[in-house]
């Protein structure tokens, strides 16, 4: 069984580049707080734009698409979904809205994770909405010639619930350590979530929702105004390269979190 342990974030051996980046982000957050009060109308408009971009981009990463006009209509509740892809888009909208409006009341635990997944998958009538996978899954990579290979084998279905419980406990333990920087902890937790791959479908989109949830809960709400998901989609080759490098050796506790942390 994979061991979830984030104590390495408090061993004084973190790369200076990561320390410098987090320092800059904290400084920018302080500046943003002042701008919000001075330019409230601008931030309201940015939030509206970013919400559409987030819903569009997070789904586009998974090949779920429709026209920009239809996405805007769905996000703004001015039109109902017309097909399966649009139902998936509506589901992400609903889960994202849940985080935007109620993140203070959503803890990082099994109840919240299953609720977000159920909210996201219910509009598309997924029979496993809000439920962990029932069969083992693999992450397959297809090269330019159409050849497939197994890139990663996630946690087996019968070990998923226990793995998710251990992930939650490890996160809570790390949160109680005042010497662990939350900005560095969050990408580690998200990487582990992706490697567990607890659901039959929707793991990638869930990882982005959980990223936003944890960022918001720790006072980093830039994702409300500049789409976090759009940035991943824009640089997805770099994102997937970092994910692949950081997931190598994960099942034997030999992986390196730093590439994914740096990308995050």
Question: How would you describe each model-predicted region?
Answer:
Residues 1-264:
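FIC/Doc superfamily catalytic core
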